[in-house]
Amino acid sequence: LTEWKELTAEDIVIIPAFGTTVEIEKRLKMIGIEPKEYNTTCPFVEKVWNTSKKLGKNKFSVVIHGKHAHEETKATFSHTTANSPSVIVRNMEETQFLTEVISGHKSSEDFYAFFNGKYSVGFDPDKDLERIGVVNQTTMLATETQEIADLVKQSVIQKYGVDNYQNNFADTRDTLCY
């Protein structure tokens, strides 16, 4: 790999299929390299980003099912946090903990300790978990993401009622990559 200090506007940088962070795109532009010119980001990854953006515009927070240290999840988190509060969950165990925060059985302090390094700056569990959509790192199992979304949905139904949950839970099944 080439060091950042060695890059010039004449260099070609190829963005991999899982995308890159907003911060890296900005850094490339500052050097004079247009990241979109050699962008091989998978369309399914971009669909997740676009869905996250739409969720943010509709005042939903985003739960990202993924491995927080994976490059695709880092890129998705970066793109998502530009538009909405976000938190990363790895599995059903972490999602169960999240639902306990949603239900009020766990506190904000519990949330911050448990999800340390996995939520966006300024995330407020007391308000940012009122309206939620779930997206995923596209290389995660679609069935597991659906189980996670279903668990979050059930938690929202328990809190807001079956007649009102659609105001608080966004159906994002169309972002799953099979």
Range-by-range predicted roles:
Residues L1-Y178:
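The feature marks the mature, well-folded catalytic cores of soluble enzymes
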